[in-house]
């Protein structure tokens, strides 16, 4: 059975962005492009209505590319259960209150039984301290917490 993965907006942005001269960003872009075909071949891949909203912002041509890139993936709606869990993640200081969208990405994935959240957002999602806090909050609410990782980490896992 395929693993259920959730693509957060930063991953889409790296996939569709023009090649960067910054070595770190270029490495992220390369890992994302290497992972992209596997998202439909090896995984049940999901995005949310929030990813659609975020991907549609900014330069119209780039927004169109981002929206086109995520079109093959299944979309998860944002429901009251996800909104409530996102509020609890923020209240528990798992995600800073200035970034409610990040808490909502996690909550949508959690309430829909997603196994892995893929993101390049190391500041508020994919760092050890956030992962520990979020896991504690989510599990205290009676849910199973998905793993949060970068595209590079998922590639190295080889699943």
Model-derived regions, located:
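Short, well-structured N-terminal submotif of metal-dependent ribonuclease cores
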Residues: 1-47, 54-67, 73, 91-97, ...
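A structural signal for short, well-ordered beta-strand segments and their strand-loop junctions
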Residues: 6-7, 46-48, 117-119, 150
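A general structural signal for short secondary-structure junctions and capping/turn motifs
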Residues: 36-38, 107-108, 138-140
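Residues at the C-termini of beta-strands that transition into short coil/loop
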Residues: 49, 79, 152
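Active-site neighborhoods of divalent-metal-dependent phosphate/nucleic-acid chemistry enzymes
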Residues: 73-133, 155
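C-terminal end-helix/capping segment
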Residues: 125-147
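Electropositive, surface-exposed helix/loop patches at the edges of structured domains
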Residues: 149-159
């Amino acid at each position: 059975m395929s693993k259920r993965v959730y693509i957060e907006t930063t991953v889409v942005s790296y996939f569709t962005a023009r090649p960067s001269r910054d070595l770190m960003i270029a490495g992220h872009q390369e890992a994302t492009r290497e992972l992209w075909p596997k998202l439909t071949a090896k995984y049940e891949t999901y995005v949310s209505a929030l990813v659609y909203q975020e991907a549609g912002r900014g330069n119209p041509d780039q927004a169109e590319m981002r929206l086109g890139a995520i079109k093959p993936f299944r979309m998860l709606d944002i429901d009251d259960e996800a909104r409530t869990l996102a509020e609890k993640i923020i209240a528990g200081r798992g995600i800073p209150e200035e970034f409610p969208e990040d808490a909502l990405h996690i909550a949508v994935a959690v309430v829909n039984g997603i196994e892995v959240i893929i993101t390049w957002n190391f500041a508020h999602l994919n760092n050890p301290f956030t992962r520990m806090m979020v896991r504690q909050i989510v599990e205290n609410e009676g849910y199973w917490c998905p793993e949060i990782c970068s595209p590079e980490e998922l590639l190295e896992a080889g699943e």
